[in-house]
Regions:
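Carbohydrate-active catalytic/glycan-binding domains of CAZyme proteins
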Residues: 23-512
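Alpha-helical transmembrane segments
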Residues: 12-15
Length: 512
């Protein structure tokens, strides 16, 4: 097993030097030898996240990415969550800009929530951003339980993406078209096969029934005509719909919010035409031919939406923060068990969308990560069992390396000796740890693997059911190329195989 560790630490190093020089007369406690010790300690997150963006105050909720051709960058709007929201007014739309999905600049507040508890947009819900003829549009959800309709679709416009004007005279109300006034949200706009703008909205039929997508069309992004509805999957509410065409295929990315440990994941459907795409959701859904019902990531990646600069298409979602009295409670607080949900909001995570020759999708690392994580750090063996010259042998074999920094890129290759070998990567582990955390590459059968999150050790709970990944094909040569990126407490792991479906199609699994 060959391991390379890269780190981003220039800012941290600069801060340390400045602090050390602030007072020549001050002598603090002696520095602990973190590099030379292996016992457990509970680390804390920095105030802001640099790679998987999180504001210094509050957290990121449902992103709305958009490629701004006028400025040549991505604008990623999102719902700003605070720890202590007002009872009726919350989730103003904030934003960041990025050219590459790995480095961000804050835009601050883009669109405020309403001025009082009785305005329709006292609270804001997610939507989308579009540009036409020099005017930027934000279509968003106005949410207020004090109003006749709890949720309606609203819009705001801007000539420069800086000064926004809410259109107080325009709304789309679900009951006017036979839909629920309580659930009518998450508008998303795209150009369909008829070269008109189409908008889909997540909702329910008025009077009850399974959830559905309401559909509208427009020639000018101003006046909208209702053109019907299409199904969701049985009784599963599919939030944050996002429709796009990539090559010869149409896709609908959605977040399945059914309250069960096997649900609440970002998934996709695919078809050759837009009409066929809508039909994929009929009874007996036509899943993508990827073997895992279109699942793109774990339950720790939600509300994913995409944007393309014409070369690369990226998907942004949020990784939930975890609460608890200590690091061990936080690490397993993932909404395990049917009916439980992870915390809402967290850090902004970006992946590159990989399209395979059969049209199926997987997620890969953002290319700019390679240049961002560019300082090599020594990987020193601190303790081991059953380890010799890069080979681990026997049950319970492991190798423990030195501590990592705040942000890291860990790259290594594993070759297993047979089709049933099981291996993993552990974190928050010391030589004295009675419980620690491992992402396990688990054999599900002879030819399939799945990434599991486990609390191991003599006091560990074992498999954490609501944080596992999805099935993927075992590499034919049993060689796994693995890249892990960390930013504070956020971790993303990519598994690649050089013996994939066809040459070059080696991105097989992503796990946040």
């Amino acid at each position: 097993m060959k391991t390379m560790i890269y780190s981003v630490f220039a800012l941290m190093l600069s801060a340390t030097v400045l602090t050390a020089c602030s007072d020549d007369e001050f002598s603090g406690d002696p520095a602990k030898d973190w590099a030379g010790t292996t016992t457990f300690f509970a680390s804390t997150d920095a105030q802001g996240f640099d790679t998987y963006y999180m504001p210094s105050v509050g957290r990121v909720g449902d992103p709305m990415p958009f490629y701004d051709q006028r400025n040549g960058d991505f604008k990623v709007l999102y719902l700003q969550e605070f720890t202590n929201n007002l009872s009726h007014r919350f989730h103003p739309i904030w934003g960041v800009s990025t050219k590459d999905g790995a480095n961000y600049e804050s835009l601050g507040e883009v669109l405020p929530y309403g001025d009082n508890d009785y305005q329709q947009d006292a609270a804001l819900g997610t939507g989308c951003t579009y540009e036409k003829d020099g005017t930027y549009y934000i279509y968003y959800t106005g949410h207020n339980g004090n109003c006749k309709n709890r949720e309606v679709v609203m819009r705001a416009t801007s000539p420069d993406f800086k000064t926004w004007t809410k259109d107080e005279l325009w709304t789309l109300n679900g009951p006017d078209y036979g839909y629920s006034g309580n659930d009518f949200r998450d508008p998303q706009i795209f150009v369909a096969d008829d070269n008109l703008y189409h908008m889909v909205i997540a909702t329910y039929p008025n009077g009850g029934g399974d959830p559905c997508f309401a559909e509208f069309k427009s020639s000018d992004l101003k006046t909208w005509e209702h053109v019907g509805r299409f199904k969701m999957i049985w009784d599963r509410m599919l939030e944050c719909p996002h429709i796009f065409k990539m090559g010869d295929w149409w896709y609908l990315v959605y977040s399945e919010s059914f309250k069960a440990s096997w649900s609440r994941k970002v998934k996709y459907m695919m078809a050759r035409t837009y009409d066929e795409l809508k039909a994929c959701f009929n009874d007996g859904p036509k899943w993508p031919a990827d073997g895992h019902e279109g699942v793109l990531d774990s339950r720790a990646f939600y509300a994913g939406k995409t944007a393309s600069n014409g070369t690369d298409r990226f998907i942004w979602g949020w990784c939930p923060f975890r609460s608890g009295a200590n690091i061990h409670e936080k690490n397993i607080n993932v909404g395990a068990g049917d009916g439980n949900e992870p915390n809402w909001s967290g850090a902004l995570v970006c992946h590159k969308i990989i399209q395979h020759s059969d049209g199926t999708l997987t997620l890969g690392a953002v290319p700019a990560m390679a240049s961002k994580y560019n300082q090599t750090v020594s990987a020193n063996v601190m303790e081991s069992n059953g380890y010799n010259g890069g080979t681990l042998s026997g049950d319970g074999a492991y190798v423990l390396y030195n501590r990592l920094g705040t942000a890291n890129h860990i790259s290594f290759t594993v070759k297993t000796s047979n089709i049933w070998d099981k291996f993993g990567v552990s974190f928050v582990r010391g030589t004295d740890s009675k419980k620690y955390y491992t992402i396990v590459v688990n054999p599900e059968d002879d030819n399939h693997r799945k990434l599991n999150f486990e609390q191991e050790g003599e006091e560990g709970k074992g498999f954490i059911e609501a944080a596992d990944g999805y099935w993927f094909e075992r590499p034919a040569d049993n060689v796994y190329s693995i890249d892990i990126y960390t930013d504070n407490s956020v971790l993303v792991m990519y598994v690649r195989s050089t013996s994939g479906r066809s040459p070059g199609e080696n991105d097989v699994c992503a796990y946040t």
